[in-house]
């Protein structure tokens, strides 16, 4: 196995890291940033943007720019009604009642969108390592259910990655934090990202990272903070002007970006100003938004959201069997933990200062890289014992959920229980697999259903049906049912309710590869266009400076080649075939090379003539001084002509330097 990269696939930003020697390292992307916005945009001309370039154009293209897609991963349409209201793009009902994104006439699954981000991270790692990357560890929120985990695996597969392991974000953070610490300690990891919240209690010691308990909320994160700010600003503006900016997608996108910036600024400053000129227009003319916002107002807006995390911390401690005083370290993970109110709430709860030695944006990817190192054999003496976040069981008589594997059970694990029939002469049983913490089956999430047929007729309660739940290290479930009398067995690998068959995943994978190839071709074409522009400029400058040194026939050929290239440049596009431009560039290069030889010959002749004239002047004049001053009898500045020739030799070499203008490389 080669290098196994670690990926934090985040709601707002994503990060990729890899083990370098004994330490995990975050890899910078092509834009020079250590984090990549989890944003994908589709332009009218078919071009696809990802990361910072996609985020930059969101204001002018909000309906076709997808962000926060992680909130829709592995989710039914009816589960994400609140999230749908918060995004500018269209979310529709797809197959199997899943949520999908409508872009033009195409419905994209969240897995496909996430795969585009993963492709970007994969390419980032390959550029850094100088080799193909196929294996990865990807992190998910600890409270992700089975469907969300499977959807994340599918996204990796579509992106061309072999997902070696899915691990929980708080657990990954603890790996990065505690890799070099051999002391026994209890650690609380508080992870508040862009769209999800988790808190985990772990015991660390002697290379063993054991998760005792985890709780969370997959509907809570920095996006919710932004939404409160957006509504506050929009309400204030509507009160002043009577205009609701939330009805205008472009204005709403500007508002969203301003709210995000204000949130970040208020993490370090007491006040900030939101200034959005020309935010909208009325019959009276353009309207501008200018508003001062202080930290106290912001904290009042989000206080109840932050308080929602407190009961989760209490539950995690209780399930772990620890008290607050047992906790040795509190680690903050996720960009939203930079908000002072969040830090104060966590520190007040645990009664100690949080450990801020790790970068909250990067620590999860670093931990994923460590786990990748464990799997590849680059890291020794590390054992990760994670837990399943929710109860797992089946529906039994009366619509009750009977739990086989309880929440916060260490994985991998396997549990069996014997059930029987509910009616006389029942020859088939349905196994309805559930995940959740509610008592009744209807209140929990269905993971799958299957039937065990061929049970011999018998009075109810007589057949012995053994149901086995088996969870692997990724937290993904296999369920089997066996009739103990006949030995007949039926099993199911619980699949995500993504509506994706193996064939569909393979098709999406091929499309993703084609997109990657097209993106590379587009970049190559853009580079060629830039080179052609630079070449045309250099030749124009050369003709202006040295045109009199080029014979008429070659000067005419050069001018024709230059005109032909400029004509091609007028219509050249990185999105289309540019074979004609490449041919014109090659012809201009050849013509310029031939002209260059004529220029060099002319300059050499001039240099020789200058040197000869200078020598004649020295013989005819009255000494060296006379030669220098150039009196009657010798041309002025003979030696200077010689120096001029030397200068001309240097100037003859025209450096065709050009700046690569690639929107994808601009931060």
From Swiss-Prot:
InterPro entries: ATPase_NBD, Chaperone_DnaK, Heat_shock_70_CS, HSP70_C_sf, HSP70_peptide-bd_sf, Hsp_70_fam. Residues 506-525 have a biased composition (Basic and acidic residues). Residues 647-667 have a biased composition (Acidic residues). Residues 595-612 have a biased composition (Low complexity). Belongs to the heat shock protein 70 family. HAMAP family: DnaK (MF_00332). This is Chaperone protein DnaK. It comes from Salinibacter ruber (strain DSM 13855 / M31).
């Amino acid at each position: 196995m080669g290098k196994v990269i670690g990926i934090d696939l985040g709601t707002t930003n994503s990060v990729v890291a890899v083990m370098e020697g004994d330490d995990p390292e975050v890899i910078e992307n092509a834009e020079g940033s250590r984090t990549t916005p989890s944003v994908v945009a589709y332009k009218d001309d078919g071009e696809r943007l990802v990361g910072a370039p996609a985020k930059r154009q969101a204001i002018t293209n909000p309906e076709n720019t997808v962000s926060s897609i992680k909130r829709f991963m592995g989710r039914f349409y009816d589960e994400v009604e609140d999230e749908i209201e918060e995004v500018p793009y269209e979310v529709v009902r797809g197959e199997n009642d899943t949520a999908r994104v409508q872009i033009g006439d195409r419905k994209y699954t969240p897995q496909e969108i996430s795969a585009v981000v993963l492709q970007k991270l994969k390419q980032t790692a390959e550029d850094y390592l100088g080799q193909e990357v196929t294996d990865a560890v990807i992190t998910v929120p600890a409270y992700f259910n089975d469907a969300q985990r499977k959807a994340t695996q599918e996204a990796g597969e579509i992106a061309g990655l072999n997902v070696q392991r899915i691990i929980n974000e708080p657990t990954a953070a603890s790996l990065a934090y505690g890799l070099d610490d051999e002391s026994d300690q209890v650690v609380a990891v508080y992870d508040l990202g862009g769209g999800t919240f988790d808190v985990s209690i772990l015991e660390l010691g002697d290379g063993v990272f054991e998760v005792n308990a985890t709780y969370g909320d997959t509907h809570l994160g920095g996006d919710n903070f932004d939404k409160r700010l957006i509504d506050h600003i929009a309400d204030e503006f509507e009160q002043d002007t009577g205009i609701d900016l939330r009805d205008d997608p472009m204005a709403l996108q500007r508002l969203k970006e301003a709210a995000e910036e204000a949130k970040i600024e208020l993490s370090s400053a007491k006040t900030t100003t939101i200034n959005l000129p020309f935010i909208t227009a009325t019959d009276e003319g353009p309207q501008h938004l200018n508003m001062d916002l202080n930290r106290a107002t912001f904290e009042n807006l989000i206080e109840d959201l932050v308080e929602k995390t407190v009961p989760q911390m209490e539950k995690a401690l209780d399930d772990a069997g620890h008290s607050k005083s047992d906790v040795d370290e509190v680690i903050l993970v996720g960009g939203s933990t930079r908000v002072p109110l969040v830090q104060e709430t966590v520190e007040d709860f645990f009664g100690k200062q949080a450990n801020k030695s790790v970068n909250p944006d990067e620590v999860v990817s670093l931990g994923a890289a460590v786990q990748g190192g464990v799997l590849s054999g680059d890291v020794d003496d590390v054992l990760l014992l994670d837990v399943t976040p929710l109860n797992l069981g089946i529906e039994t008589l009366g619509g009750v959920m009977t739990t086989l594997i309880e929440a916060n059970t260490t994985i991998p694990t396997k549990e069996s229980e014997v059930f029987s029939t509910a009616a006389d002469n029942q020859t088939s049983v349905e196994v309805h697999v559930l995940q959740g913490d509610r008592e009744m089956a209807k209140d929990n999430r269905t993971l799958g259903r299957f039937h065990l047929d061929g049970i011999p007729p018998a009075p109810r309660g007589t057949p012995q049906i053994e149901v086995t739940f088996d969870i692997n290290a990724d937290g993904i479930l296999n369920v089997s049912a066996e009739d103990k009398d006949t030995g007949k067995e039926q099993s199911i690998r619980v699949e995500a309710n993504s509506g994706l068959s193996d064939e569909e995943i393979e098709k999406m994978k091929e499309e993703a590869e084609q997109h990657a190839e097209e993106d590379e071709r587009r970049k190559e074409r853009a580079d060629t266009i830039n080179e052609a522009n630079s070449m045309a400029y250099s030749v124009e400058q050369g003709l202006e400076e040295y045109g009199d040194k080029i014979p008429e026939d070659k000067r005419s050929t050069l001018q024709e080649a230059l005109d032909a290239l400029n004509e091609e440049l007028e219509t050249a596009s990185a999105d289309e075939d540019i074979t004609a431009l490449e041919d014109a560039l090659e012809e201009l290069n050849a013509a310029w090379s031939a002209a260059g030889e004529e220029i060099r010959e002319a300059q050499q002749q001039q240099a020789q003539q200058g040197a000869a004239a200078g020598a004649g002047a020295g013989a005819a004049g009255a000494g060296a001084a006379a030669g220098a001053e150039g009196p009657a009898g010798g041309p002025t500045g003979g030696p200077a002509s010689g120096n001029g020739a030397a200068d001309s030799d240097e100037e003859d070499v025209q450096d065709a330097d050009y700046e690569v203008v690639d929107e994808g490389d601009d931060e």
